[in-house]
Amino acid sequence: MRVQPLNPAVGAAYWQGEAVGDSILLGGFSEVNKWIALRGWAYPHTLILPEAVQHRQVPQLVPEFLFYGFIFREGNFDFARKRVVRRLRLVGTPRQLERVRDILAVSYLGTAPEVLARIRPNEDIRPHLDREGAYFALKDDWGRIVPLEDYIELIPWGEDGTVTLDKSVTVARADEGAYEVRAEGETAPVKLAYDGDQPPVWQVPTGKADVPRRFGVHTLGSYDGFDPRGPSVSFIVWLDGHRVLLDCAPYADRLLEARGVSPECLDGIMITHIHEDHTGGLAAFAQVPKRLKLWTTPEIWRSIQIKLAAVLDRSVEDVANDFEFCPLPTDEPTTLFGIRVQAHYSCHSVPTIGIRFENDKDALTFTGDIAGRDYLDRMVQDGALAPERHALLMGRVYRTSGYVIADAGEALIHGYPKDHFGRSRVYLSHRSVTPVDGSFPPVLHPGYEIALDSGEVNAHDLSAIKAVLSQWGAKAHWRENLRRKSIVREFPPGSVIVSQGDTDTSYAYIISYGLCNVLVNKTLVAKLHEGEFFGEAAFLDERGIRNADVVAVSPVRLICVPGKVFRELLSDEVEHTSVEERLRKILKIRPTLQNSALFAGLPVTQLNELSLLADEVEVGPGDISKEAEKADVCFVVAEGSVNLTGANGHGTLGPSGVFGSGVTWRAGSVRPCPVRALRPTRLVRLPAGTLPELARRSPLVRHRIAHLSTRHR
């Protein structure tokens, strides 16, 4: 007997028995089905649900496409006899089984009565969702919609931590993340816990930056959810110079990073529907430093909350706070960043929207996932699609002007290339291969761009300069000075722009677009994105020594400020504080914040802002409880140590330790922890009100505060 790892580093394993279809998958992380497809293995009959929730921001409980593959691709629904042949077995704790049922219910039975009761569609759209969803749903001989329980078998672990599958196969839980498969008289140990990366099965496309546009689209992925050759559906849409992520496929954060885009550079996310190949990457954006806007309809938003809460094992109310929900109307157009936006409900197995973006010169339509044209005609004949809905879809999808990105996934609930035969300015999505006949529209591949209005890259340069001057506190006239006197250079990925230890004050740098890593002694300490700066430290060091390596992660466009110009700028003074004084304060305080459990990983822009707000406090050995008890005050230990006394006993915090009323307890739940300095100690103090405001803007900080407050009780 042999248990096969999917890949040496992915944290899942596959067991194949002697009987056809007798297989077990241990672990179910994002896009694990694509690893199975790459190996040419059958979809597993049994899924052992993993104990981990996330690994390096990759969700671990993602059963959706494993379910679709087992039921449909393995032929476990008999369409002739209208019944399920074999049920997918899911093994886990009661809580895991509850979560996986929520995910499958809202994703597969997205318009079933039990789901509609939870997502509460408005009265105008509910009849359409009811009727169209029922038409797509598989039914038995009596015309009854096949319920989820007919497709899956939920199996809890036994009290002894084992479960017996069939006659001779037993799976046992060992240590955390470890199992044993016992079959055929043999035992095979399986360990899922590991420290490595969990990459996608496909190669992340590199070498191309997301160049700013006034109006256009940049394809991150357009493959379907089963194809292991590439990423699923995600696009960057530029709306009057604002960057919006349209749909959020698994590993979308990595696709963005390869294009030089961090989450903080997004102006928001727009979601068409909740299927995994369109939302599998959302979990990574639920705990980022910036609370992102999320545009969709109220029905789809409530579906997202249900699914994301189950994936992350959190409450619906909690995940709702990770994004700023912005309702997208479907009954009338709205305006977003100066662009006219018209959304409409598509015709799919779950609530889905198509979207049209339009300025005064051109238009761009995303059809959203939608049933094929012939199928829509048949639905009208069968009374499942109202004539007015059919007319609306024909106009919005097949007779619209401008560019069209069309679903051509070729299935019951997807469109077909022939639906757009002979049309110009149409591109196919949800597939990887263009039909041979040249009259069919081409397929969008990762990296393909459509520029409806390129605009001026110089305008983006000016925006980056303005953002940096705002941080520096420099006068407004410096914006034009830097634009005229600086040099613009572009660097490919892997370029070492400055090297630690070099004596060089030729330039200070502002990033117009792209992403850079900052390394000190070859250790990554920060990532820099557009609107951030580097190279200033050498000008503040009397020896002119560079204190870090800065390496381009993606193609990078830099505004290189000559040393002479930068030295003049350092002496600029606003409200009795020079730029040099502000930068020196940032360089002194930022490392303390950067190394703390609460603020590590925040964008450098946010760390700079906090550094300028903070001050330093020197305390000798003794009681500093009164200072620490002030409302919403936060301290970070820079040097020395303090002792905290809480309900869980004593604790000592050294350098980078965080304490204060905002982090050591939840307001009103427990009394403050007494705090005492153990030796001469230097503290960085953030003023009252800073932390609540930061937590409101940053899901990452909010979650960390909750974690720290529990630890310090």
Segments the model singles out, each with a brief description of its role:
Residues 1-37, 52-53, 331, 398-400, ...:
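Binuclear metal-ion centers of metallo-dependent hydrolases, dominated by the metallo-beta-lactamase
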Residues 1-147, 152, 161-259, 352-373:
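Conserved beta-strand hairpin/beta-sheet module of binuclear metal-dependent hydrolase folds
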Residues 255, 261-289:
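Di-metal (Zn2+ and/or Mg2+/Mn2+) metal-binding site signature of metallo-dependent hydrolases
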Residues 138-165, 194-196, 203, 298-352, ...:
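Metallo-beta-lactamase
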Residues 26, 245-249, 265-277, 295-297, ...:
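Active-site neighborhood of phospho(di)ester-bond hydrolases with catalytic His/Asp-centered motifs
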Residues 440, 451-713:
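Cytosolic regulatory regions built on CNB/CRP/Popeye-like sensor folds
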Residues 226, 274-280, 302-303, 332, ...:
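Active-site environment of divalent metal-dependent phosphoester hydrolases
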Residues 330-384:
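Catalytic core of the metallo-beta-lactamase
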